[in-house]
From Swiss-Prot:
Quaternary structure (record): Homodimer.
Pfam families: LuxS
Residues where Fe cation binds: 54, 58, 124
E.C. no: 4.4.1.21
Native source species: Levilactobacillus brevis (strain ATCC 367 / BCRC 12310 / CIP 105137 / JCM 1170 / LMG 11437 / NCIMB 947 / NCTC 947)
Official protein name in the record: S-ribosylhomocysteine lyase
GO biological process: quorum sensing
Keywords: Autoinducer synthesis, Iron, Lyase, Metal-binding, Quorum sensing
Family (UniProt): Belongs to the LuxS family.
Domain of life: Bacteria
Cofactor needs: Fe cation
Nucleotide-binding recorded as keyword: no
Cofactor mode of binding and number, as noted: Binds 1 Fe cation per subunit.
Length: 157
């Protein structure tokens, strides 16, 4: 079986919340994609409940695109501690951390239920599993800790 980089990361050594570049790859036509680890809570110490995480996912899908160019996808980790962010080109972890911070701030302080996209049976495969209250509370807690541009040393932006 192929080795997956995310499973070789020492999850006991990282200090969440942080942004980490997992990989940067160049396609056969020269296009560059980057995969970032947006770790919101400390692995094996916490996990965001699915309803809150699901709502954060839907909001990040739009807000990150408002904050930075080149967003392809932002998908939650199965362990519920953060997200993969896939982008075109070569953004720095600091650029991504700033976009993430701004997006989480919008969720925590500016978002109302009407702002959450994809919350009906036609636009979401699990539309009943959302909580804006949970999303806001988790985002406030994450922002209070500060988002680091480095996974191993706290370099809060």
């Amino acid at each position: 079986m192929a080795k997956v980089e995310s499973f070789t990361l020492d999850h006991t050594a990282v200090k969440a919340p942080y942004v980490r570049l997992i990989t940067r790859e160049t396609g056969t036509k020269g296009d560059v994609i980057s995969n970032f680890d947006l770790r919101l809570v400390q692995p094996n110490e916490n996990a965001i409940p699915t309803a809150g995480l699901h709502t954060i996912e839907h909001l990040l899908a739009g807000y990150l695109r408002d904050e930075m160019s080149g967003v392809i996808d932002c998908s939650p980790f199965g362990c519920r501690t953060g997200f993969h962010l896939i982008t075109w080109d070569e953004q720095s972890t600091e650029e991504v951390a700033k976009a993430l911070k701004a997006s989480l701030h919008r969720i925590a302080y500016d978002t109302e239920w009407k702002d959450v996209q994809g919350t009906d049976k036609y636009s979401c495969g699990n539309y009943r599993d959302h909580s804006l209250f949970s999303a806001k509370e988790w985002c406030k807690a994450i922002l209070d800790e500060g988002i680091s541009k480095d996974p191993f040393t706290r370099e809060v932006i």
